[in-house]
């Protein structure tokens, strides 16, 4: 009789139900995703600096293993802005305002960047997993329910117009989680 190894469980620190649903859709059933909301103050810095700080503080608060995520939307014409501050830009100016930022520029290209940080617990060196998807910024199309999905176009469709499974295969988040899955699989072998 062969027994399989117990399924790996991660404690994903988020209060965003859309992010949680995407992470669960990509990782489960291979990796069980539990969720916990913590109020973590985000430092200002690069995406990597923000993620490292967040994962270290989350591991200390939870006193155990955690997974955190930070996302950027980088406009090439604006040398990477809004970058890691996209959440605050979205809350302040919305889809139309983000499009207006690029109104004076011919270049509408952008990068969607997702960085997950995993820590085995307090004092453990965090590991980062990053995914990038190239696209462009367009006027909003599709349901406006998940951040900037309605204005980020990849190969003719905005994220918001895509089927969820299709989006998860090509998205910045999906690419980062693929790296996380590979890392966990390598550690089991």
From Swiss-Prot:
Pyrophosphatase that hydrolyzes non-canonical purine nucleotides such as inosine triphosphate (ITP), deoxyinosine triphosphate (dITP) or xanthosine 5'-triphosphate (XTP) to their respective monophosphate derivatives. The enzyme does not distinguish between the deoxy- and ribose forms. Probably excludes non-canonical purines from RNA and DNA precursor pools, thus preventing their incorporation into RNA and DNA and avoiding chromosomal lesions. The lineage of its organism: Eukaryota, Fungi, Dikarya, Ascomycota, Pezizomycotina. It comes from Pyricularia oryzae (strain 70-15 / ATCC MYA-4617 / FGSC 8958). One of its GO terms (biological process) is nucleotide metabolic process. Coiled coil: none annotated. ITP binds at residues 14-19, 54, 70-71, 87, 146-149, 167, 172-173. It holds the Pfam family Ham1p_like. Keywords: Cytoplasm, Hydrolase, Magnesium, Manganese, Metal-binding, Nucleotide metabolism, Nucleotide-binding, Nucleus. The keyword Nucleus applies. It is found in: Cytoplasm; Nucleus. This is Inosine triphosphate pyrophosphatase. GO terms for molecular function: dITP diphosphatase activity; ITP diphosphatase activity; metal ion binding; nucleotide binding; XTP diphosphatase activity. Binds 1 divalent metal cation per subunit; can use either Mg(2+) or Mn(2+). HAMAP family: HAM1_NTPase.
